[in-house]
Amino acid sequence: MLVVIMFFIAFAFCSWLSYSYLRPYISTKELNKSRMFYIT
């Protein structure tokens, strides 16, 4: 039972970490796309 809880916590932590890493990359990508569209 404890192993399942630990696995769930690790999975949630990894998903949160990947989300926090990918969110600024996605936002800057969208920003650059809109900026290029605005320039052209």
UniProtKB/Swiss-Prot annotation:
The chain crosses the membrane at residues 2-22. Residues 23-40 are virion surface. One of its GO terms (cellular component) is viral envelope. It is found in: Virion membrane. It is a single-pass membrane protein. Unglycosylated because produced in viral factories instead of the classic ER -Golgi route. It comes from the Viruses. Keywords: Late protein, Membrane, Transmembrane, Transmembrane helix, Viral envelope protein, Viral penetration into host cytoplasm, Virion, Virus entry into host cell. GO terms for biological process: symbiont entry into host cell. Induction: Expressed in the intermediate phase of the viral replicative cycle. Its main location: virion. Disulfide bonds: none annotated. Belongs to the orthopoxvirus OPG076 family. Component of the entry fusion complex (EFC) composed of OPG053, OPG076, OPG086, OPG094, OPG095, OPG099, OPG107, OPG143, OPG104, OPG147 and OPG155. Except for OPG095 and OPG053, each of the EFC proteins is required for assembly or stability of the complex. Component of the entry fusion complex (EFC), which consists of 11 proteins. During cell infection, this complex mediates entry of the virion core into the host cytoplasm by a two-step mechanism consisting of lipid mixing of the viral and cellular membranes and subsequent pore formation. This is Entry-fusion complex protein OPG076. It comes from Variola virus (isolate Human/India/Ind3/1967). The gene is OPG076.
